Each structure stands twice: as C-alpha cells, then as structure tokens.
Amino acid sequence: MPILFDCNAIASQVLKDEASALLESVGQFQKPNDLEAIVKLILKSQENGGKLVIVGVGKSALVAQKIVASMLSTGNRSAFLHPTEAMHGDLGMVEKNDVVLMISYGGESLELLNLVSHLKRLSHKIITFTKSPNSSLSKLGDYYLSLKIQKEACPINTAPTTSTTLTLALGDVLMACLMRAKNFSQEDFASFHPGGLLGKKLFVKVKDLLQTTNLPLIAPSTSFKDALIEMSEKRLGSAILVNEANELVGVLSDGDVRRALLKGVSLKSEVRHFATLKPKSFKNLDALLLEALEFLERHKIQLLVCVDDHNKVLGVLHLHQLLELGLKA
C-alpha cells in the first residue's frame, strides 16, 4: 500500500503539539496551585506508613502504572488500583494512611466517580488529574492538577496522545518533588536498582564476582608448552605462577607469550625465565568493581589476581568481565 502523505511532516507536528502542551502546562505552576500541598500530603502519608494509590482506567490506567513504577524506583511507596476491580474486593488494598491519585482526562469516568464516594467514606484524601477543576471528578477531590491541552496530537484529535504525555509529565513532577524533599541521592537510586549500571558501580564488590575455581595455576618450572595448554584450557588469557604454598610468584600474560615467541624461546623452556615476576596483585576483596577497574587500567593489566595477607592466591577477576557489565573508569 503506497503512503500518500509525508510521514516526517506528521512526526514534526505530533512532537510540536505535545511539546507545546508541556510548555503551556508550566503556566499552572506560575500561579496559585495545589502542588506543594500535594507533595506535603504524600510525605505525611509516607511518614505514617501510607502509600500513594494511583487509579485510572483505559489509557490512564497504563499511564498510572508507569507513574507507580517511577515512584517505587525512587523510594516512594505506591500501588496501582483498577477502579472496576476496586469495586469487587481490591478496595481492601487501600489502607488507613494512604493517599489516592485519580487520573481521568475528561474527569467524567463513571468507574472513577463510583469509587470516589467509597474512598471519601473511608476518609482518604483524593488528588485528581483532569482537564478541568469543574469536572465531576475534580469537584469531588481535595487537590487538583490540570491536564488541560489545546488538542490531541493524533490526526483526528481523538486518540489519547498529548493528554497522556502531559499526564506522564505531571507524574514526573510529583516524583521529582518527592525526591528533592527526601534528599534522594544516586546511592539511594542505586539501592533500588542493584541490577543497573549505577548499582554495579556503587554496590557490587570484587568478592561478588571473583572466580575462585578452575584457575590457570602453574609452577614456575612449568614448560612453555604446558603453560600454553593450561592457558588455552582455562581461557583467561594468562597463567598464574604459584609455589608449593600457593603463594603468588608471577603471571604469564598473553603479552609475555608474544614476546617469548618473537624471541624464539623454546617450548621446553621453563616459564619462570620470561614470565612477569612479582606482578601487581590485589588484596581488598571488599573493594567496589569500579576500584578494581581503575586498578587494572592504572597498571595496564587485564587480570586482577587477588591474594590474602600471606600472598596466597584467592581468585581472579578479568578486565573483560567488568567491561561486559558496562563499567567505565
């Protein structure tokens, strides 16, 4: 099917319409509004063990779930409640000190209107996001932020586009205010995202990734040939020279191997003659991965050999492991 219109022109118009709505919404925060009162309300709720319950139906339900996810990721207790399910038992999830945010662009959603009276009966404070303070829903609520827009960005001015973008943005406004009020830090964020890059930088330690088995350990008297076999089998690009007490003596790196081959060293030669003796080693297993990476890059080595206070080999960590995690010094 041929496309008989300019996709780029539509893309430009959609983004301009949505950007304009966001900029116009700034105006509501340049005159008296409920934002500060809402932030204080949520903070007081949290102090008393409560949470922010966010309600929406249709597209607003999906936006509500995203706002819940953002709140949780920044240390703010939150939960999504579907209004229909609430009327059939899920209302029990709304606890004594909870605050409720109800999202409805038009503010006339019957599902939400039916739920409001039950929430008010239980003495819950209601925040509303709608297009007008005169909507039925906002009249029943206690606090209000505006979703007013000039038009939806879709070609027929009907599908939720600009309105859902603005709703997401207002959710971000609440989240940002709560973060600032609680002095939420990068360390706090990382604690809620241990699997993310920041979490790895701030929380994962050397001992958490240390390889302690199947190590390429060889004696200083090992032949060049046998050392190459050991390096090939263990796939770390190096071999570790240890004495009978398992104390670190040296490291045979791939660079040592290349230099030996260029010099024509016999495969029968003992590796102690051309390996790196008294290599750099690492003792602090409680160090963060970023510190380990900085150590490797500072000394221009690829294998972090970890030893105890008696210089006995405990395990290794390879530079590639850290780089694969996305770490950068």
UniProtKB/Swiss-Prot annotation:
Entry keywords, A to Z: ATP-binding, CBS domain, Nucleotide-binding, Repeat
PROSITE patterns from the UniProt entry: CBS, SIS
One Gene Ontology term from the biological process aspect of the record: carbohydrate metabolic process
Protein source organism: Helicobacter pylori (strain ATCC 700392 / 26695) (Campylobacter pylori)
Keyword Repeat: yes
UniProt: ATP binding residues: 56-61
Domain of life, per lineage: Bacteria
Domain named SIS: residues: 38-184
Family according to the record: Belongs to the SIS family. GutQ/KpsF subfamily.
Source taxonomy: Bacteria, Pseudomonadati, Campylobacterota, Epsilonproteobacteria, Campylobacterales
Segments forming domain CBS: 211-267, 270-329
Protein name: Uncharacterized protein HP_1429
GO MF term (any one): isomerase activity
